[in-house]
Every structure is written in C-alpha cells, then in structure tokens.
Amino acid sequence: GFGPMEMTVAKGKRCSAAGAYLRPAVARGNVQVLCNSLVDKVVFNGTRAEAVDFSLHGTTHRVKATYEIILCAGSIMSPVILKRSGIGPAAELAAHGIPVVADRAQVGENLMDHLELYLQHACLQPVSLYPTQGLLAKAMIGLQWLLTKRGLGATNHFESGGHVRSRAGIVYPDIQFHFLPLAISYDGKSLTKGHGFQVHVGTKRSKSRGFVRLRDANPASLPKVQFNYMTHPDDWLEFRACIALSREIFNQPALAGFAGPELAPGPYVIKDTDVDTFIKQKVESAYHPCGTCKMGEGDEDVTDPQARVRGVQGLRVVDASLMPQATAGDLNGPTIMLAERCSDLIKGKVLPAANDAPLLVSPNWLQAQRSWDMTHDYANDRDSLRAALLLNAQNCISNGENPQLDFSKN
C-alpha cells in the first residue's frame, strides 16, 4: 500500500534514540556516559564475562560488571568487539593471536543492508521544491525553522511512500518506495534546471550476504567489511522490477499532467543490459547494516532468543546485528523496538500475552502481480514495454486487485 511516511521528528527537530532514551536516563543520575572512549574487548573469567577494557584520552581502563555486560556497538563493531574478546571463528582469532573463549563461526557473518536507487522526472507544473534551492530561499527556510520549528526545515521531505510485492508468489511486500518532490542527488546536484520529482526505490529482502572480519587485534584498526552487494542473481531481477514498477507509477493517469520527460535512467534505458548498467552505476546503500550477531534458536546462531551470546555467560548483544533477516522497512524503528523488547527481557519483566491476530495478506498473493513480467527479457522488445506501461496507465488499482498482463496478446 501507499501512504504518508513516519518520521522521528519531535517539535520540528530530528529525534534520535539518544535524545529519546539516553539523555533522559542520564538525567536520572544512574547512567554514566563516557564519550570519546574506545572499547577494546570483554574480559572473561573462563567463559564468564566479568569486565570491559577500554581506553579514554590515551589511558587504558577496566570496568567490572556486577551482573552482565550488554554490547550495543552496532552491526559493524559488535562482532568486531566479540572477536577481539575471543568469541568468533577459531581460525580467524588464531590468525591474529587472540585466545579463543568460544569458537563461534557465525560471528560477523550474515551481513545485510538495504540498497536503493532513484528515478527522476521533470515536472510539468511548478509544484516541486525546486524554488527552495536558491540561497535566499534556504535562508528564509532556516529562519522560519529557527523561530518556529516549522515549515520546510522541519521535515525530511520524504513524506509519502509505499510497499509493494514485486511479483506473484511473495506473501509480503519486498519493494519500498520513497517519493521526493525534487529531482536532486545526495550531493546536491540536479539533472534539470527546473521543477522535477523522483522516487527512491529498493528491495528489502536481498539474498546477498557479506561479512565483518578483523584486520588485526588492535582496537584502533578498522575492520574488514565486505557487503557483497548484488552477488545473488535474484537481486538483479528485483531491481529491474523496482525500475519497472516505478515507471508504471509515473505513467499513471493521475500524474499525466505532472510527469515530464524521464531524466534518470532515461527513456532509452530499456534493455536488460542497459538497465543493469544503470543499477550498477547508481545503486547505493541506505545505511542499514544488520545481521552480524544473528539471533535464533539454532546452536549455530550467535545469540539466543534472549539476546545472550552463545557459548559464554553474562554477555548480551542488543542492536541491529541481532536481526536474522533485514526488516522490510527502514531499520530505525525496528531497532528501537528490538531494544525495548530486550530491555524487558533483561529486567525480567512479565510481558502480556502475545497478540496473534492474523496479518493482512492479499488473498490472491500466489497468482496476482503487477503487469511487469520479471521473467520476460525486454532486450530489443520495446513494444512489450510500451504495451505494459500503457495497460497500467489505463487500469487503476482497485480493491487490492492487481491487473494481469499476457504479453502474447499485445
């Protein structure tokens, strides 16, 4: 479905997890935050975690735990700290001279991320944010925000979006759209000197997997991070669907008076080879790494369903690295939810009974799909492409039904 996007904005300001949770906790007086400190490792007595070694302003410190240690360093650094502490693949630890506390092969594996790219159109009507790009306009927006915390400075402008299924046989949406009323890249450059708009679109369940590994045992050294983006063939099919479905949206009758020429990838990027080249050049990270300390019930999983690190005692991980599969939406909200749930587990809070109300699923998810056929090769077949776009431009989505298209009849 499509609708307004949720934002973490409070009183006109971006609201971080630190602002919502950490600063109020510090104000209570029972939390001490040491900024500019660098954690080296967790110290064990046998397999019991009992202390943390860290440096602050060039001095090494050790702080002992009364009950347990909770590691919240994120999907890149949590597995790195575990490995420096002796928890990880035995061969990798031995290669860096680190004594093995627990041989856990999956620490640092299963690295996932969300990728996206954007399609841009010129806009036929003067309704985009293009006039705000001048210095005077930016100054006025900034002044309004400083005085009132309202206006264009109080939003990220991705105010609408959607989630769809890329093809039949997928139960839940696997493609996400973010719409922006401006044609611009993240570096501030624009393909047009005028009004435009764009959609940021990407897959949410990539099958590609990467890893995080040690460069050495020095806590100041950066780790080796390899995402292995687009290494699974299904990722290419799904991103072709992203582009096709975005074009379908921009060819809807409701946008006929607004959608001008396609700026990116461009109207002549149709062949699969050309589309793949565009994907390769333009796809980029949404900065949602997760999965490297995978939670699960299997013995091979890094953490158990209580977020406890397997093979040792007194150590938990609480961050997005726990996710066994990337969520089908952005990670900020799910990560906060995960942390709240783990907080209840750590405190031993008795939770209410689970609400097992059935999730809404399209009744014909096995058969229904958009008219774009992911198995069809569009190389040298622009007639089929035009027929597909034309058909979808003539058919509005109604009652949750998706129109079918048999290319053999066009």
Give the location of each predicted region:
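Conserved redox-cofactor binding core of oxidoreductases
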Residues: 1-49, 55-57, 118-142
